[in-house]
Structures are given as structure tokens and as C-alpha cells.
């Protein structure tokens, strides 16, 4: 039974997560020739303050800059 774990920074809508689950299930089922009802998908969401990029929190790394860039 394939088990897929996805970690995302918070902010996706329920509809986006539902689509992700459906598409991952299809891809795994097709690739591994496994019935879709045997595929498990878990989504774990992390806050932007708890995710680091280059030594700084994602919330800081991706914050808009004074010049309008991020």
C-alpha cells in the first residue's frame, strides 16, 4: 500500500488540497500499477514561521521588500 506524505507551507485552500490528493493518487496508482483505493496521501501543513529557507523563516525570506519584490 503506497503512502505519500506532502509537507506544505500553510495557505492552500481545501479545494487545492483535495485536487492535490486526487492527482497524486492517480499518478501513484498509474505508475505503480496499484488500485487507487490502496493509495494513501497525507498532507502536513507548516506555518511560515516554522519553515526555514537559507537560515531564515519562510515568513521573513518571502516577505515583500521595500522595492516591492519578494
Question: PLM features: what roles do these ranges have?
Answer:
Residues 2-70:
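A domain-level signal for the structural core that forms small-molecule/cofactor-binding pockets
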Amino acid at each position: 500500500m503506497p503512502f505519500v506524505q506532502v509537507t506544505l507551507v500553510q495557505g492552500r485552500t481545501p479545494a487545492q488540497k483535495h485536487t492535490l490528493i486526487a492527482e497524486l493518487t492517480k499518478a501513484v496508482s498509474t505508475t505503480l500499477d496499484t488500485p487507487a483505493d490502496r493509495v494513501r496521501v497525507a498532507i502536513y501543513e507548516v506555518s511560515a514561521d516554522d519553515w526555514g529557507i537559507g537560515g531564515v523563516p519562510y515568513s521573513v525570506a518571502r516577505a515583500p521588500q521595500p522595492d516591492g519584490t519578494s
